[in-house]
Structures are given as C-alpha cells and as structure tokens.
Amino acid sequence: MNQSETLFAQAKTVIPGGVNSPVRAFNGVGGSPIFFTRGEGAYLFDEDDKKYIDYVASWGSMILGHTNQAVIIAVKTTLENGLGFGAPTQIETKLAEKVCELMPSIELVRMVSSGTEATMSAIRLARGHTGRDKIIKFEGCYHGHSDSLLIKAGSGALTLGVPTSPGVPKDFAKHTLTLEYNNIDQVCEVLSEVGAEVACIIVEPVAGNMNCIPPIDGFLQVLRELCDEYGVILVFDEVMTGFRVALGGAQAFYNVKPDLTTLGKVIGGGLPVGAFGGKREIMQSIAPLGPVYQAGTLSGNPISMSAGLVMLNVLSKDENFYTILNTKVQKLTKGILAKAKENNIGMTANVVGGMFGLFFTDSQSVTNFKETSQCNIELFKKFFHLMLAEGVYMAPSAYEAGFVSSAHSDTDIQNTIDAAGRAFIKLT
C-alpha cells in the first residue's frame, strides 16, 4: 500500500468518502485518489514524491502553473498584514476595476467565495430583478450545487424536471427547465411557450463539465437574441472559461455579451473565490443598493483578492499569452490524436483556448451531453490509469475538461504525447 492509499483509508474515517468534493474520490475511474504534497510549474508531486505532469490545474485555476512566484509573493505580502477583516479593503476595488476593464459586459461586480455562491446569487438576482421565477439551464452544464441548479431534464422540453440529488425538493424542479445544450430549436420552442415566465437563461458558453463542449456556430448569438426578445436575462457561467479561453473570457472569444457573468477559479489565483457581475441596472438590485439580498463573511478576502489581481495583471501584460497557450493545447491534442490513429483507436478532441477534451469515439464531433455519454467511458478509465502510471495526471472523469498552463514546456507536451502512444499500444 502506497502513501496515498494509506492516507485515503485514514481520510475515510473522518471525511465522507474520504474527499471534500466527489470527483476527487476517483469513482469515475476506479482505484484510489492520489494525495499530493506540492506543485511546481506544470508538475504535481504525490506523497511518495512521484512526479506528474498536471492537466487538471486545480480544475483550471492554475493557468500560470503551480507556485507562480508573482502570485506567491503577493499572497505572502498580504497575509503579513492580516488574514481578513470583514470590512472593505482597497484590494477589493482594485480587483473589481481589473475585472470590469477586462470584461466590458461587467459594469459592477460583487465578490463572493466560490463559483457555486456566484451562480446561486446570480440566479436570485435575475429572479429578483425580473420578478419571474423560471430559469433555463442546459443538460451537462454544471453551475455548482445550489438546489435550483441540481435539476435534470424531464421526458420533454416542457416536462417537469427531476432533482439530481436527494435533499432537493421536487417543488424546485417546476421552476427549472433543463434543455439540450446546442439545441437552438428547443430553446425557441420553450421560450415561445413560457418566455414571459423565465427570469434567466444560464449557460456555460463552453461546457466544461461534460468534458469540453464548445457552442455550435450561432448558438450563443441566438441565445442573446432570444433573451432580448423575451426580456430574459442571459447569464454566462464563466467560472471555468473566464480568463481561461481568452483574456476577456468566452464572451470575448465568441463576441457575445451576456447580461450577467459568474466567475471563479482563475480570478482567485488558485485561492477560494467567486464573483458575479454585469449590467449596472441589474446589479443595482443587489443589497445594499436594492432589495435582493446577498452577503458573505469572507467575501472579498484580501488574500484571495491579492492573488487574483496579480494573476490578472500577469495575464493582461502579454498580448501573446493566449495564442501561445492555445498553440500548446493544439500540439498536445493533435499529437495524442495522431498516436490514437496509429493504433486504430477512435478518438476526437475539442479545443477552446487553454482547455481541451478527449473523447473515445468514432464520431467526428461531440456537441452535447448525450453524445459525451455515448463515448467509450470504459476505455477512458483504462487510458486514465495507464497515463497515471506514466506520470501524467488527467481529470479522473470522462466528463471533465483538461487544462494546459503557461508553465507546460514543449518537452512536457511531447512527453505526454509519447506517454499516450505507449498507453494506446496497451489498449489495443
């Protein structure tokens, strides 16, 4: 038994399932999770000091790699003055100004402590501002674990949905319509029936929790047009894509302006943080300016704010940052696909900016949750463990996107491609 297995057994005695977030338990791939002790650049090191090339990047947060010194120095400097005050600080305003500068759709922004808190608050704000109760979300898009968003689709577009977790009252389902991602006709159909009752449409502009699924041509643009037509607030959940696929997020990448945006991950430099923001007229409905209540003891924590500000400053200084990052992702995925083809293994890939998805399928494209579920999940599980043995750490689920950081070198990318080649040989 290695150190990770020993620690996992110990963790299970005091933590439900031994983890503080379910995907970490390796239930999606089998086996025991790896316990890490440190990160450095593109690498993670486990309790036995084995080194891994990391493509999870703390679920997308570590776009500069682990222990980036600019971020570390900012955090150390800030914490020497105190861990938090529960009161306003200048650094909150500076980060808010930077977010508004980089994302023009955001005129006012409120800091919170997680992505779930951001989406939950944005939904409440949309309902409070419009006076409507219904929301539309899309199958396979994850927006955190608040009750309103843990609803799966019914048998038809307007059929009552079903909670995806015990503990979520069935009454919540009547207010949440879950549609197929990238299905424009279905959105048109539903809005034509109940558009006057819908407060908002919330969508991951690039879905990252059914692996990596980009929007088909026109999907986001039509959502924008339909929301304008029916007076519905368009919410982009950019917790994953914000500052990851482009400096201005997916909304800049696809040139579509939402009314509200939720943020997390990169905006905190790797520390716990979230944010939601958007049009001034909508954001002014939030307390203390308006009647929609939202609050948080740790919101705007100065350590998280300082890490996020340095992160965004670094990203915005290099105009070639995202071009270089995408070049790395393209090299990685094209190399892996070539190795798969050499071994007669069906595989396709999706790439947007600094994120990617690999799918074991003979299909040329994967565009929604149903198509992701039809991929060869069992083959992915075997591939995951073969890559782990090669010292490559990928997301422990066929439904999670992968991420490259600026710290990944050409050698890291090539070593990963070579490792995939050896793994494919063992799969055949």
Swiss-Prot record:
Keyword check for Isomerase: yes
EC number: 5.4.3.8
Location of the protein in the cell: Cytoplasm
Catalysed reactions listed for this entry: (S)-4-amino-5-oxopentanoate = 5-aminolevulinate
Location of N6-(pyridoxal phosphate)lysine modifications: 265
Pathway the protein contributes to: Porphyrin-containing compound metabolism; protoporphyrin-IX biosynthesis; 5-aminolevulinate from L-glutamyl-tRNA(Glu): step 2/2
Top EC class, one word: isomerase
Cofactor names: pyridoxal 5'-phosphate
Annotated keywords: Cytoplasm, Isomerase, Porphyrin biosynthesis, Pyridoxal phosphate
A GO molecular-function descriptor: pyridoxal phosphate binding
Entry superkingdom: Bacteria
One GO term (biological process): protoporphyrinogen IX biosynthetic process
GO cellular component: cytoplasm
InterPro entries xrefs: 4pyrrol_synth_GluAld_NH2Trfase (IPR004639), Aminotrans_3 (IPR005814), Aminotrans_3_PPA_site (IPR049704), PyrdxlP-dep_Trfase (IPR015424), PyrdxlP-dep_Trfase_major (IPR015421), PyrdxlP-dep_Trfase_small (IPR015422)
UniProt-listed NCBIfam families: hemL, PRK00062.1
Family: Belongs to the class-III pyridoxal-phosphate-dependent aminotransferase family. HemL subfamily.
Self-association and partners: Homodimer.
Protein name as annotated: Glutamate-1-semialdehyde 2,1-aminomutase
Gene designation: hemL
